[in-house]
Each structure stands twice: as structure tokens, then as C-alpha cells.
Amino acid sequence: MLLAQQLNLYILKGEIIMKKIKIAIVFGGQSTEHEVSRNSVTSILKNINRDKYEICPIGITKEGKWFQYTGDINNIKNGQWEKDNKNKLENGYNVLFNKEVELVFPVLHGLYGEDGTIQGLCKLVGLPCVGPGVLSSALCMDKIYTKYVLENFKFKQANYVVVNKFEYEKNKEEIIKEVEKLQYDVFIKPANSGSSVGITKAHNKEELLKGLEEAFIHDKNVLVEEAINAREIEVAVLGNDDPKAAVPGEIIPAKEFYDYEAKYQNENSELLIPANIDNIKQEEIKELAIKIYKLLGCSGLARVDFLMDKESNEVYFNEVNTLPGFTKISMYPKLWEASGKSYSALIDELIELAINNK
């Protein structure tokens, strides 16, 4: 009987029947990546195996209201689900707090989704959650603290300066002088944002000042990094204690760098899968990705991004994304597809990893 429960089976009239696992798939949210989340979850809902799972979609509006949604999946992608009052039930919170589901699959990009917030909620109510836990999610979300940790372990990174809004407003000239010890061009990044939201590239002091003001809209702490003439390489990592890496991919941005528009609105950006690098370098990058994944305490999944110098081929750590984009054309699932794992099989494995991640 215990074995049957572990395998999610029950017996009906002498036949072994697989009991469906009830999963809450949470989407939307209050971050600037709300629309990205809707795209990702639409793809997941269309490809998840309904023979294995009973799905309970839970949408969070930009205002922070939770609803269970039972209507047309296509209404999620275009945002019309919020107006579909007939299929919008005001019990989104209760589904989790009353443990009406067995597992939570958060498809919430950015703040309140991959920063440890919903992971903490799941831990509090005792529900398994797809992806990394509270600490690793929070750590990887903050670009500055991720850099501090990996710097301690001697991983190569671009030269950088951290700017705090309060200190900047008190000592503007002094801080600009410190930042300008870096060589232009520089990237200016809010510490906690994904999908390149709020990121700008500065070629001079005037653009630096504008970029800092833009970044401070999104976060009080900002990372200013020296730009490297580099190729953008991304690695999909999957697993708990013994993670594996897919073939690396490369991004050829349509613009000067891979900002929000280039990612989601400009169809001229290219994804090269696998990246056009030799096998020895591919293995080196995959090993680096797995080391970083384990050092940061990740589980389930993450995408580890690197910069590879176009002249020296030196590899520099860029960032970790613990809940990467999940449309069928997103890099993370496409890298696994190129490595022999279908989109549906990837979803299955993520759910299994969450269940087994004690």
C-alpha cells in the first residue's frame, strides 16, 4: 500500500490506476515581468501532460490579487483572463493555504516570484515547489550578492562597482568618480530585476548619469559593470544533488545588447543552439555552470549565463536565472530539446525533482 502511495497509484476493480498529481501553477504577479510570465505559463499549460496532472491555474494580478482561473488558456496570454469573471474564482490563496494541491509550480518571473518570496510561502504551508528554494532563489535574484559569493570562489567576472541610491544622492560626484575608474563602455543594472528590465549601456558620463536614474526606478542598489567585447553564452542546468547541463547556446542580439526589447519584441535576435564553440570549450562552460549552480545552492533548474571574450575566449560569469523564460522558443527548454529532452518531458522532470527535493 505504501509503495502504491509513493507511486501515486490506486486500485479500481482490480486495475492499477495512476492517480493524477494536483498541481497549482501560479502565474502573473506584481513584477515588471508580468507579461513574460503569462507567455511562459500559456506554453506550459498547453504542453503539460493532463493524463498525469490535475492542473489548478492561479493568476496573480498586477495589483496582487490571487484568483483560481478555470477558463480558456488563450485568455491568459493576452491578459483577458482578468476580465473573465465567470471563470475567475476568488480563492487563489486558499488553494495553497488549505493544501488543496500537492505541489506548486511557480511561473512568476522577477520580484515576488524568483526571489524566494513564493518559495517561502510554499515552505510555510508545507508544499513542494518547483525550482530552487528560499535562500538560493533570493541570492541568485540579487546580482550584487551573487557576484560577492562567486568572487570569493575566484570565478572570473567583469570589473564592477556597486552604487546605492541613498549614498549616490549624498555624494554624487564622489561616487561618479569611483564608477569612472571603470573603462567605458559600462552596463548599468538594477540589482534585482530580470528580463533585462532597467538595464542600459553607457558610453560616456552623460549616459551613465541617465542610466543610473533609470536603474534607481527599479532598485535602490545598482550594479555598474565594465562591458566586455563578448559573446553571450547560456547554459541550462537541471537537477538536485547531481545536476546536469544541456548543450550551451549563444545569443546574437538584434541590438547592441540583449535588452528587454531584443528579448521579447524584436524578432531579429538569434539563438544559436548549440553555440558555435568547440567541444572542449563547451565542456569547460558546462562544468563551470554546474559548479556555480551547486555553490549557490540551486535545485530543480536554473540558467547560468556567461560572457566569452571574442578575442581571448576567456569565460566570465554573468548571472543566474532561477526561473528562466519557459515558452517553447525560450532558451532554457530549447537547450534541453537540443540535448534530447522534449518540452513535456522537461516539465515532468521538474515536477519529479520538486517532489524528491526533501
From Swiss-Prot:
Keywords: ATP-binding, Cell shape, Cell wall biogenesis/degradation, Cytoplasm, Ligase, Magnesium, Manganese, Metal-binding, Nucleotide-binding, Peptidoglycan synthesis
GO molecular function: ATP binding; D-alanine-D-alanine ligase activity; metal ion binding
Start and end residues of each ATP-grasp domain: 147-352
Details of cofactor binding: Binds 2 magnesium or manganese ions per subunit.
Enzyme class at the top of the EC tree: ligase
PROSITE patterns on file: ATP_GRASP, DALA_DALA_LIGASE_1, DALA_DALA_LIGASE_2
EC number: 6.3.2.4
Record-stated family: Belongs to the D-alanine--D-alanine ligase family.
Protein's recorded name: D-alanine--D-alanine ligase B
Organism of origin: Clostridium tetani (strain Massachusetts / E88)
